[in-house]
């Protein structure tokens, strides 16, 4: 697999996350998204953005009835948002992006459903469970010219958002010539 592919994906993931987090207020049009799966804790970030009116969730694909009921109750979601068949949901709703908060082993199926429709996909880290899956996902992304992003949660940290705001938005420290970051979790 091309060694330059994953750093590019990481950069794209950071860019998408920053766009979703930092520029929603300035956006003329809200992003239309489909959520694939509700079993990853990071789904609460997008659900909270939905609750604040910062993003349009046009559909949710989830097979676990208990999760569906819990999210319907917590976020007052209508039945019409839910469809267990991701392919049918994507064809009907035509979102701009699919956010995959499902099991890692199911990330490939999300890309296989979305890529042929020209819909970009963000998955939670890690990208895949095997190199073969990752290579297939990369091949689909190239073939259908979509963005395939991996969400590294550290980009959502308040400290990183503040650093971005100070350096990029407010230009508080001037031009950055070199940057060394030690970040992450175990």
What kind of feature is each model-predicted range?
Residues 1-28:
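Bacterial Sec-dependent N-terminal signal peptides
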Residues 59, 96-97, 178:
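Short, Asp-centered acidic motifs that coordinate Mg2+ and/or phosphate
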Residues 56, 120, 147:
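Residue-level detector of anion-binding/catalytic polar loops
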Residues 21, 25-75:
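N-terminal Rossmann-like dinucleotide-binding module
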Residues 35, 123, 148-150:
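Hydrophobic residues in well-ordered beta-strands that form the structural core
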Residues 28, 128-186:
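A contiguous active-site-proximal alpha/beta segment in oxidoreductase catalytic domains
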Residues 77-140:
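Beta-loop-alpha module in the N-terminal Rossmann-like domain of NAD(P)-dependent dehydrogenases
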Residues 39-42, 107, 120, 185:
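Histidine-centered active-site/metal-ligand motif
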